[in-house]
């Protein structure tokens, strides 16, 4: 559904990889019940979706093929989506220091076919934006094993190299930890909004005291 967005971190252990899940632009409420519609294969836990087996099933008796064709017939001129809704983001697990270089691997930024192939990605850490080119190649050495990237997570990869300027710590002259929100944009729009809650921790040094200032 176009009202659902999520992020995942493929470097995390199984069961901990989903790092955010938004419905209608807001984080899901763990105290609410949600209705999920899909084919029986996925609802039975296929493709490693075991969480879908925990709900109460309602079988409608329709074939996905028939409903898909009905939808296309009722929506003349429908166009393929360009904005991805599932993005792989691996952020530093430890705090970073200003001017310290770190990398942010990204996956699933593009569709494998059609108009939704982004050429660029922008990752913002608070007000600091860093840009990178996107690799949309479908060639993959590990296409059929667990080291797969494209087969598992889709096309559109980038490894962003970033370092944050000392100015990010201007609001924290006393030093200590600073939390910066992380957002991700492609050529087609925002794919990881601030509401996703992804962050980077920055360790700010104590600001140097100006000559003549009172201690």
Residue ranges of model-derived segments:
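Catalytic centers of hydrolytic enzymes
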Residues: 1-214
């Amino acid at each position: 559904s176009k009202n659902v967005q999520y992020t995942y971190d493929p470097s995390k252990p199984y069961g901990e990889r989903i790092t955010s899940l938004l419905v209608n632009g807001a984080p899901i409420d763990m105290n609410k019940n949600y209705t999920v519609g899909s084919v029986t294969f996925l609802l039975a836990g296929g493709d490693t979706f075991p969480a879908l087996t925990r709900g109460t099933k309602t079988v409608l008796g329709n074939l996905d093929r028939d409903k898909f064709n009905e939808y296309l017939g009722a929506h003349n001129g429908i166009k393929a989506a360009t904005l991805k809704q599932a993005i792989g983001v691996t952020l530093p697990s430890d705090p970073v220091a200003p001017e310290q270089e770190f990398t942010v691997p990204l996956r699933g930024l593009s569709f494998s076919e059609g108009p939704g192939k982004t050429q660029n990605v922008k990752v913002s850490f608070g007000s600091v934006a860093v840009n990178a080119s996107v690799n949309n190649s479908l060639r993959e050495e590990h296409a059929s094993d667990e080291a797969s990237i494209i087969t598992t997570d889709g096309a559109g990869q980038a490894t962003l190299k970033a370092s944050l300027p000392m100015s990010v710590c201007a609001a924290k002259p006393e030093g200590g930890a600073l939390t910066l929100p992380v957002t991700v944009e492609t050529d087609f729009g925002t794919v990881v909004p601030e509401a996703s809650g992804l962050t980077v921790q920055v360790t700010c040094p104590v600001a140097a005291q100006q000559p003549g200032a009172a201690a």
